[in-house]
């Protein structure tokens, strides 16, 4: 551990103690030596005693900077780990930091381009359009076509700082698992590992550019979503150049109302976009908070979304997609037995789980929701409660499903903010039913067979030889099995004969011994003894030697 990491660790602990977060630790994590270290090395007074624990954690993470802010945002979606109060507080964390110097941004951009900015762009503005914890955005005009673009560039040394904080987080998580018995259930090390994968993905702007290109191609003919054009020739790990868009932030409800936006259509399109990305494309935007979503200014009666920041994208396996769709449909039909079966069949919960107990737990959670009108039932919270219930049955955490849950909560919250009467169930159910029909119906079967036809056409000439080889192998197996059976029968015969002789010899020996002690004819006991010895010798020698068949 370097001096810098020790210094950073001290600063993190000091900040957490300033907000009195040691007060919320369970007794298992505060033994006498912890209290001794707390009072001797960290004589910091808790200045926020009157504030709730969730608010104190939010303020501490805000002060600790970008890595902790993003961790807090991720944890806000893990209500299976945190209470609702704490999760709601963390959801309010904003990834807003002061911009870094425009001259440094210019230097970083030119290092990636290996050319002066003015040779490729006009009107480069050193004052950033937006600034976040990992990167900031500058505007310019492309020399080649005169179109407005934005240049997204990583902050200087951001990778080093993030790696150092991640290492510290990982060590802390392992310590928590060691000190706290419940740590194994909460799996803090696993949570930090999921976070590490997510945030390191955001540090590669070339990867983000490729994600944006793929998402754009998926919705080229869509009336619901527009993804700005990416200039791939100017994209590098630390730099991304894309078309500049002019929209209204989805959180600016007043501006959307002023232009006469059709909120009902906009909300329904948001739901359809989510399910299309997940079930049709298997490639969904997993960071759809209001800062990344804008609404078109043209045609407010027929509005569409503009999606930015494709650094975090999610995918599901075909198995996960099918089980998820069936899960939702089973919930629509209040089929709790099927929901429990699906969790076990999918491998999300151990196959050793008590199915009836799990079904009952799901029913206890879900049944009260049906006392509300359908348009008041939260789709995201249904999924959340199901995973929280499954947690008590040792659910295996699926990172891709955590991303899905987070995205669904964002989309649903956004849809109801735009149009409070949004009936998400009515919008989603036909889509899911149609998708399931497409997956298991005759057309789907024909499609799956047709995709395999080239493979089988290539293998068809080999069939006669394969059939002949299998028949030949079958004959060999039959012959081998017959030989084994013959050997086994021979062994059994020898064993029976040997056992018969040994038992007879034992009887003769016992009789001879008993007769010697009685007034029997002189020669009778000795004949029995000699005969018994001879039979024992013959029986012993006739035992089968080889037990391998």
UniProtKB/Swiss-Prot annotation:
GO CC entries: plasma membrane
**Main subcellular location:** membrane
* Catalytic EC class: transferase
Which UniProt keyword terms apply here?
ATP-binding, Cell inner membrane, Cell membrane, Kinase, Membrane, Nucleotide-binding, Transferase, Transmembrane, Transmembrane helix, Ubiquinone biosynthesis
Q: Name one GO biological process term.
A: ubiquinone biosynthetic process
Signal sequence bounds? none
Annotated Protein kinase domain ranges read 123-501
Annotated active site residues, numbered on this chain, are 287 (proton acceptor)
Provide the protein's localization: Cell inner membrane
Domain of life here? Bacteria
Pathway(s) the chain acts in: Cofactor biosynthesis; ubiquinone biosynthesis [regulation]
Q: Where are the transmembrane segments?
A: 496-516, 520-540
| Record-level Gene Ontology MF annotations | ATP binding; protein kinase activity
Task: Please state the Enzyme Commission number of this protein.
Answer: 2.7.-.-
Report how it sits in the membrane. Answer: Multi-pass membrane protein
InterPro entries per the UniProt record, alphabetical: ABC1_dom, Kinase-like_dom_sf, UbiB, UbiB_bact, UbiB_kinase
List the CDD domains: UbiB
Residues the entry annotates as binding ATP: 129-137, 152
UniProt entry tagged with the keyword DNA-binding = no
Q: What does this protein do?
A: Is probably a protein kinase regulator of UbiI activity which is involved in aerobic coenzyme Q (ubiquinone) biosynthesis.
- HAMAP family of this UniProt entry? UbiB
Q: Which NCBIfam families match?
A: PRK04750.1, UbiB
Family label: Belongs to the ABC1 family. UbiB subfamily.
This protein is called Probable protein kinase UbiB
At the highest ranks, the source species' classification is: Bacteria, Pseudomonadati, Pseudomonadota, Gammaproteobacteria, Alteromonadales
